[in-house]
């Protein structure tokens, strides 16, 4: 059985940890409010751009823009993975990394063995994980969420489109956590390039479902749809990836707040258990001392 001193030391350690987790929960809650607002505000704009692009795609020959044209054969694939920079956010990174591994090691197993699956990792956790295991990470952004801005999304899109247009990859996937609620995010894996028109029965992400709720309008375009579509495609890609980063950031803060709340509750329960153990040990020590005193007194009486 642990000594009173050892139990006191452990109680002090747990109290210190509890203060830390409680503070982290409060910080995550404050960040979540800002991140959630940014993510939700980005959804309508991204949805409207997608609606316009779908409308235009039905009026023109999509072969005018290579980013709209599927390749006849997919020989090389690029995976854009979005994780967090920091830990202590529950299963946030674990689940999304597992999804990426399944896509690469199962769906594209043959390509992966031949080194024909490339990765762009946004976030330190995913970047470190896949680099250490020998995956073909061509670009990494390990501190992207320290100062998240639109230029970060534009840079990733530029790298992805360069690889696609040069023929180095024939398909681009994006995998990320989409903010759903405070309890759990949506794990999303979708095709980023080539840009495909939205399907009527596509369940997809919350953002995709929001897009379905927007009525399709038969627009009159000026100048020509062909000119507009070439201007709209890069804006659409930049906006969609920016939304992905915002969604992931909001989901990360929600996961961290939930994880720290759970850790604080666990620390509280552990303190209660340690207090009971300490009181029992203290009572046992006092009882032992009393017995020793009584035993000593009896011995003195007998010797007298």
Swiss-Prot record:
Protein family: Belongs to the ATPase gamma chain family.
HAMAP family: ATP_synth_gamma_bact
Keyword Cell membrane among record annotations: yes
NCBIfam families reported in the protein's UniProt record: ATPsyn_F1gamma, PRK13425.1
A GO term for molecular function: ATP binding
Gene name for this UniProt entry: atpG
Sequence intervals crossing the membrane: none
Role, per record: Produces ATP from ADP in the presence of a proton gradient across the membrane. The gamma chain is believed to be important in regulating ATPase activity and the flow of protons through the CF(0) complex.
Pfam families: ATP-synt (PF00231)
Topology versus the membrane: Peripheral membrane protein
Subunit structure: F-type ATPases have 2 components, CF(1) - the catalytic core - and CF(0) - the membrane proton channel. CF(1) has five subunits: alpha(3), beta(3), gamma(1), delta(1), epsilon(1). CF(0) has three main subunits: a, b and c.
Cell compartments where the protein resides: Cell membrane
Listed SUPFAM superfamilies: ATP synthase (F1-ATPase), gamma subunit
Protein name, per record: ATP synthase gamma chain
GO BP field: proton motive force-driven plasma membrane ATP synthesis
Gene Ontology, cellular component aspect: plasma membrane; proton-transporting ATP synthase complex
Keywords: ATP synthesis, Cell membrane, CF(1), Hydrogen ion transport, Ion transport, Membrane, Transport
